[in-house]
Design a protein with these regions (language model features):
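Beta-strand-turn-beta hairpins that frame and shape the catalytic cleft
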Residues: 3-14, 106-116, 185-188, 257-263
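A general structural motif
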Residues: 9-10, 36-39, 72, 111, ...
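Residue-level marker for buried hydrophobic side chains located in beta-strands
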Residues: 13-15, 42-43, 189, 246
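Core catalytic region of metal-dependent phosphoesterases/phosphodiesterases
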Residues: 16, 21-111, 209-211, 216, ...
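Catalytic metal-binding/acid-base residues of hydrolase active sites
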Residues: 19-20, 47-48, 81-84, 120-121, ...
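Proline-aspartate-enriched helix->loop->beta-strand connector
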Residues: 38, 185-195, 233-247
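Binuclear metal-dependent phosphoesterase catalytic core
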Residues: 109-110, 230-238, 250-275
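Active-site-proximal loop/helix segment associated with metal-binding centers of metalloenzymes
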Residues: 112-226
């Protein structure tokens, strides 16, 4: 079932690229550099949850809360590959002014409804200490890390780590059915990666270097994009009036209008207002 987040007081919505744990800088940019007020900022993954103990994030929230309250702003975090999925259940991080939402959540604002779907394959996973034991045991086949519908996964540890098995995106048919039958329209989509027709700016030489140690990486990355393609196809099938699709992950900027949808890749800390 899709979780709905309503922000009826919001007068604008912006989407931000990867922040990689720079929570204080994000709020400073929002409230001081950009002077945002009455704004919902959605972070398109790689937020940085999971690299520290849980109480660390509570401390950060309490530190930035006064600025968010004074400016009447909110932060919505979407899951990236450099995030512990356990934080993105809609409950673990659920402050009044910031929240880490589960996949296929719908952010409802006077500016439109935004569908949030996280996840991606870490291209640098072989260099992550938490990944290497699985690799050497021969368990790095991408299918093991994909979340099939109806799959009841074991609880993900909240202990600090640098990589998590359930990092990839998944297509949730039941969530899309829920949105469709509820009569909710989607005007914008925020994901961590884009559909296959979108730019990914991954240098071939870099991929070749990574594949030497991680041979299943290209296939896993391809499946990620195919998952986004399936999401796009379902949105079109249900006739959602999608105008914007924004994503991060690649640490570069790019944008293009394709078949009536404005696709935007955001670099780290780059913010774009939805209009």
């Amino acid at each position: 079932m899709t979780r709905i987040y309503e922000f009826q007081e919001a007068k604008s919505v912006a989407v931000c690229g990867d922040i990689h744990g720079k929570f204080d800088e994000l709020v400073y940019r929002m409230t001081t550099l950009c002077g945002m007020t009455d704004t919902v900022v959605i972070v398109a993954g790689d937020c940085g949850f999971g690299f520290h103990k849980r109480d660390y994030y509570d401390q950060v929230y309490n530190r930035v809360l006064p600025k968010l309250e004074k400016s009447n702003c909110w932060v919505v975090f979407v899951r990236g590959n450099h995030d512990n999925p356990a934080y993105f259940d809609g409950e673990t991080v659920s402050g009044k002014r910031w929240m880490a939402v589960d996949d296929y959540s719908l952010v409802v604002t006077p500016c439109g409804n935004i569908l949030c779907v996280g996840g991606a394959t870490s291209v640098d996973r072989y260099n992550r200490e938490s990944y290497r034991p699985l690799f050497h045991l021969g368990k790095n086949e991408g299918v093991l890390y994909r979340k099939p519908i109806g799959y009841i996964e074991e609880p993900v540890s909240m202990d600090p780590a640098d990589w998590w098995p359930m990092e990839t995106p998944y297509f949730d048919e039941s969530a899309m059915e829920s949105i469709h039958h509820a009569g909710r329209s989607v005007q914008a989509v925020v994901t961590h990666i884009g559909p296959s027709m979108c730019e990914d700016v991954m240098p071939p030489t870099w991929i070749d270097y990574l594949v030497e140690n991680d041979p299943t990486l290209p296939a896993d990355m391809r499946r990620d994009r195919e998952t986004m393609d399936a999401l796009l196809a379902r949105l079109r099938r249900d006739c959602h009036p999608v105008r914007h699709w924004l994503y991060g992950h690649y640490h570069h900027s790019w944008q293009s209008d394709i078949n009536g949808i404005g696709y935007t890749m955001l670099r780290e800390m780059e913010m774009k207002e939805l209009r």
